[in-house]
């Protein structure tokens, strides 16, 4: 079976499932957005996204159309990651700890396209998807928002 075709099909299924059928409470959240004790360092730190407990190799679809701003390993603890800018909403999404990245900087990505695979790269305790949602704050600066609002 063609791996890319399977990945695109699986990712589109996950995207439809996520946005239309799954409630935030049903997502496999292994670490919530907000303040927490970091599982490796033991420090009290702000967690800028949510960790979703998907198996290594699970396809990751882009949640919205967007432009790839970062793609690869930036040695910032996220391991392999993709940062997408979504001009229609003036927001960003980051997908981190990926085992494989399928997109390149400046590439335009359509909603549902597989951008990579869930992995365990960077500063992690195991395979998962770290998902961030970055929006304009009240003062015009970009701020982290709880990604689970996308499912409410």
Language-model regions: role of each:
Residues 1-5:
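Positively charged n-region of N-terminal signal peptides that target proteins for export
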Residues 6-15:
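Sec-dependent N-terminal signal peptides
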Residues 14, 18-80, 89, 111, ...:
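Surface-exposed, glycine-biased beta-strand/turn segments
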Residues 47, 97, 128-134:
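Histidine-centered divalent metal-coordination motifs
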Residues 134-152:
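Short peripheral tails and domain-boundary helices/loops at the edges of structured domains
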């Amino acid at each position: 079976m063609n791996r890319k075709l399977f990945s695109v099909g699986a990712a589109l299924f996950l995207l439809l499932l996520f946005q239309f059928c799954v409630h935030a409470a049903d997502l496999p959240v292994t670490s919530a957005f907000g303040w927490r004790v970091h599982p490796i360092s033991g420090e009290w730190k702000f967690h800028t996204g949510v960790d979703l407990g998907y198996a290594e190799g699970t396809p990751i679809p882009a949640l919205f159309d967007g432009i790839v701003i970062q793609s690869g390993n930036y040695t910032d603890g996220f391991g392999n990651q993709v940062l997408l800018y979504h001009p229609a909403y003036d927001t960003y999404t980051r997908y981190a700890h990926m085992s494989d990245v399928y997109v390149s900087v400046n590439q335009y990505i359509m909603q549902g396209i597989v951008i990579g695979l869930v992995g365990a790269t960077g500063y992690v305790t195991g395979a998962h998807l770290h998902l961030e949602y970055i929006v304009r704050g009240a003062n015009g600066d970009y701020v982290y928002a709880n990604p689970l609002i996308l499912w409410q």
